[in-house]
Amino acid sequence: MSQFAILGFIALGGAFGACSRYLVSELCVVLLGRGFPYGTLTVNVVGSFIMGLLIAAFESELLATEPWRQIIGLGFLGALTTFSTFSMDNVLLMQQGAFFKMGLNVVLNVTLSITAAWVGFQLLKS
């Protein structure tokens, strides 16, 4: 497969990931309000779960073809999840003096994202 085709697959996945991130974030604001960065937390945990599934699928050769790795892994999940937004959310919480919320956000993002990746991986491995 040519490098141009691979870049096209990554861009396609990225477009869907970015749109999904926006929609999930907006839905979280509607459902849960703006008092906590629920949107970032949600996309990071869901993205980690999908990555766990994806890694297990590649290992078991359920998704052995290379375009899927680029479309889902680099494109979709790369655009869906975000460390820079997570960092900025925490800076804003710090500036507001909301140190408990900031700490909670850090703990929840790290713990739930790693747990979700492990659960996703285990689901397809067993």
From Swiss-Prot:
Record's catalysed reaction(s): fluoride(in) = fluoride(out)
Pfam assignment, any one: CRCB
Chief location: membrane
Membrane topology: Multi-pass membrane protein
Protein's GO biological process: cellular detoxification of fluoride
Activity modulation notes: Na(+) is not transported, but it plays an essential structural role and its presence is essential for fluoride channel function.
Keyword Ion transport in record: yes
Keywords for the protein's UniProt record, in alphabetical order: Cell inner membrane, Cell membrane, Ion channel, Ion transport, Membrane, Metal-binding, Sodium, Transmembrane, Transmembrane helix, Transport
Residue sites binding Na(+) per the record: 78, 81
InterPro entries per UniProt: FluC (IPR003691)
GO cellular component, one term: plasma membrane
GO molecular function: fluoride channel activity; metal ion binding
Domain of life: Bacteria
Subcellular localization(s) per the UniProt record: Cell inner membrane
Residues spanning the membrane: 4-24, 38-58, 71-91, 104-124
Family of the protein in this entry: Belongs to the fluoride channel Fluc/FEX (TC 1.A.43) family.
Entries under HAMAP family matching the protein: FluC
Protein function: Fluoride-specific ion channel. Important for reducing fluoride concentration in the cell, thus reducing its toxicity.
This protein's name: Fluoride-specific ion channel FluC
UniProt organism field: Vibrio vulnificus (strain YJ016)
